[in-house]
Amino acid sequence: MIDLYSAELNEATRFLLARGLLSSYNTAHKQNPRHGVRELVASYWRADPPKMVGSVPHAELHRELTARNSFDLRFLDGALMTFKYEFSASGKGQLRRSAVSFLPSPDLTVFQEDPELYLGDALFGDVVDEGAVTVPLRFDYDAREAVVEELRHPVSHLTIGSYKHCRIPLTCGASPYYVIEFVLRAFYQTPTLAWSSDLPGPRTEPPVATISDLERTLIHVALPTA
């Protein structure tokens, strides 16, 4: 499983680089097994792990991650993406935990409004759109019995903003392809540009649903499942 996730992330990174959408990146590597766990993470997670959850304001967290080079992908508009995956080191190497964050830049105009500013290599550091509200997103997966609690802490969930207890149920975990495709389609698609349609397809099979029957009866986010 870790090989498929690694392939998806590497292929997506090469795709984004080839189309000039990234200004910087850090490659995630498959770590050696430790305590029955094998991680797929970039080096910044091992050296000085960033604190992605807490009361730090979005703008401050974004500036800190950028200054420390603590991200996997940095888009031309300054938006960051971080990926952290943990797999079982035995058996089929199933996914145990994951945390994927999208942190839009708090300082620049959004890509959709004027893509030529970014694709034309213009200097846009002083361009600020006061009407755009930047909100971080985090896709989490954690199937540990001690953590999971129906509705309050779904196995797979989406957090919008920095609300500590915001956990919108997802139908299942999301591999790198699905999160990156969502980000491209939701935040970088314009009437003439549809990057997500050319993104290399998923390597992984749709996972088994983790959402409970009760969670399905309420507002939730659906991902492709087996």
Predicted regions, residues:
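Hydrophobic transmembrane signal anchors and adjacent membrane-proximal interface regions, especially
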Residues: 4, 23, 39-42, 98, ...
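Short, hydrophobic/aromatic-rich beta-strand segments within well-structured domains
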Residues: 82-84, 101
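Short beta-strand micro-motifs enriched in acidic
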Residues: 84-90
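An exposed acidic His-Trp-rich patch
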Residues: 91-174
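Long, compositionally biased interface segments
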Residues: 168-226
